[in-house]
Amino acid sequence: MKIYEVLLSDETAEILIALSRDWEAEGNCHGYRANDRSDLEGSRVFLAEEDGAVVGYLFGHSYRAKTGSSVMAQDTPCFEVEELYVVPARRSCGAGRALFRFAQAAVSPGADFITLSTATKNWRAILHFYIDELGLDFWDARLFLKTR
């Protein structure tokens, strides 16, 4: 498997948008909608490729914390992972881990923290992935109860 960073081109945008449509069709994330080009603009993009086909992606952006918190001081440089997606056939094979680790190495010179949010319906699996496998710390939770 080849993992690399790529500049956003028309071809790359088409690939990411097609994969995000597949992700939306899976229906495994609350409120997820497929990307359009504007969702990708200004992002750093990392791809996982196998046998010439893109099997996963991670994209995100750098930012500075606007307010201080119990975790980080105001103006702390961070990198927000907007999306990390791996095609179903390549899940649990290390592609997501490899994408995250590659992006971590690439962004860490300019970011004190990597942050992300998730809306997956399988929260146990995603927390296992991010906390147990990748070593992220749990910081915040937003829960909901549908009443009607």
Segments predicted by a language model, with ranges:
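Conserved GNAT acetyl-CoA-binding A-motif
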Residues: 107-119
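Conserved beta-strand in the GNAT
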Residues: 47, 53-62, 80, 85
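Conserved acetyl-CoA-binding loop-helix of GNAT-fold acetyltransferases
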Residues: 86, 92-105
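Conserved catalytic-core motifs of GNAT/GCN5-like acyltransferases
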Residues: 65, 117-119, 127, 131-148
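Short hydrophobic clusters on alpha-helical segments that form packing/core surfaces
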Residues: 81, 103-107, 126
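Short amphipathic alpha-helix that is part of the acyltransferase structural core
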Residues: 1-32
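Conserved acyl-donor/pantetheine-binding loop and adjacent beta-alpha core of acyl/acetyltransferases
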Residues: 59-79
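Active-site rim helix/loop that mediates acceptor-substrate recognition in acyltransferases
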Residues: 24-49
